[in-house]
Amino acid sequence: MPYSSIDDLPASVRTHLPPHAQEIYVGAFNGAWQEYAWEGPEEREKSAHRVAWAAVKRKYVKMGDSWIARGD
């Protein structure tokens, strides 16, 4: 299911990502959810999460336990 806000994200995402990265995650997840409407429910969910993590990783890098904004 698409997320209405960052407050709706799973705790595993909310507690690890900074707020801006959470916004990226929500936007990418929701966009992918629409894009992959033809997939079955479980595969659609997995695909949307993969896209969301990829979007976050384009703007942030994980250093230790923290996600740091990329300088580029």
Question: Where in this protein do the model-derived segments appear?
Answer:
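C-terminal alpha-helical interaction appendages
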Residues: 1-72
